[in-house]
A protein has these predicted regions:
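Short, extreme N-terminal segment that most often corresponds to the first beta-strand
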Residues: 1-54, 66-68, 287-311
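Structural alpha-beta junctions
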Residues: 28-37, 149-167, 249-258
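Aromatic/basic-lined ligand-recognition segments
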Residues: 170-310
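Internal, hydrophobic cores of structured domains that mediate oligomerization or house catalytic pockets
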Residues: 76-196
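Conserved aromatic-histidine-acidic binding/catalytic patches
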Residues: 7, 139-147, 232-236
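Short, well-ordered alpha-helical segments
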Residues: 17, 149-152, 238-242
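N-terminal low-complexity, intrinsically disordered segments
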Residues: 29-32, 36-114
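Short beta-strand-to-loop capping motifs
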Residues: 8-14, 125-127, 232
């Protein structure tokens, strides 16, 4: 039902009037019956046109609750469980996204801000709101890059409202400021995957002499995430984050052309080769293109276990 989702975490819930005051486009308020579906599915909301020719809508709703990081259960919290299952918090979002975002965030001030939030504003895209039951979820000539850019610009505007704390992209498990996002978008035509995704560096507890680098969030752009595992003293380690970011941007810009067997190299000429992995080493659950250094003879079997704890 929804193809993108970015949120703004707030110290207190803003009003729809607060939202309208910072928006440059005309927005219509949701009918009362729609807002009464329950805060999990739709809070008090505004709707803006995105692509009118295919019924594209940008929906912005106010949730006067903390971000629900747990999925709930079909027995005790059926509405929350259904909302997660239907992608109401993002099409590629998994439970625990905010917890993992805080765990991996280097800027601890952003984490402190996120921990203060009591409400959030959710920005989503849909092509089936108010449409007939046979409407397609994805229209012809669907462009996830243009779509995510539109949602990002709205998030930047909403981050200027009094009480806004930090942006949270649950699909990318990423915290960032509106200014950081604006700076990245202003670099166009360079694709800002460095803010649309998380590029993580993890030293596993069982094998502290190894490092795991990966991306989270490329599913927003309809391409695979990337992963690179290597010894901590390997020459590519200092280039790994930039290398993954570069390959992710290339893959997204060209519509997902990278595949197993493809090769790349870091700035010092050390080669890596792609393999397909149906399960990433680190959560959230997803398939990844796993890049392997050409001079690496073997990766320990322990690194094949999902969700390794950090050292």
């Amino acid at each position: 039902m929804f193809t993108q989702c970015i949120t703004v975490l707030f110290e207190r819930a803003p009003t729809l009037a607060d939202l309208k005051a910072v928006l440059t486009a005309d927005a219509s308020e949701a009918p009362a019956a729609e807002a009464e579906q329950g805060w999990v599915l739709t809070g008090p909301s505004l709707t803006l046109d995105h692509r009118k020719d295919v019924n594209g809508k940008l929906q912005i709703d106010v949730i006067d609750q903390p971000f629900p990081d747990a999925m709930g259960s079909p027995d005790r919290e059926p509405t929350l469980f259904a909302a997660w299952s239907m992608g109401h918090f993002g099409p590629t979002t998994y439970p625990g996204a905010l917890e993992r975002a805080c765990l991996h965030e280097v800027d601890r001030e952003l984490v402190a801000l996120a921990e203060k939030h009591t409400a959030f504003v959710r920005i989503r895209v849909s092509y089936v709101l108010g449409a007939s039951s046979d409407a397609t979820v994805l229209p012809d000539h669907y462009d996830p890059i243009h779509e995510l850019a539109a949602v990002s610009h709205l998030a930047i505007d909403l981050s200027t409202i009094e009480g806004a704390l930090v942006l949270f992209n649950p699909n990318a498990e990423r915290l960032l400021t509106g200014q950081r996002l604006r700076t990245a978008l202003d670099r166009a035509p360079i694709l800002p995957v460095d803010v649309w995704t998380s590029v993580r560096r993890v030293r596993p507890q069982q094998l502290p002499d190894w490092l795991i680098f990966d991306t989270v969030g490329m599913g927003q752009l309809d391409v695979a995430d990337h992963q690179l595992v290597l010894p901590i003293d390997h020459g590519t380690a200092v280039h790994a984050a930039a290398l993954l970011c570069s390959m992710a941007a290339y893959d997204a810009a060209h519509g997902g052309v990278l595949s197993p067997g493809d090769t790349a190299s870091d700035t010092d000429g050390r080669g890596v080769t792609a393999e397909w992995s149906s399960e990433a080493t680190l959560g959230p659950p997803r398939a990844v293109l796993a890049w392997v250094p050409d001079d690496l003879e073997e990766i320990p079997q322990e690194l094949d276990q999902p969700d390794l704890p950090e050292a």
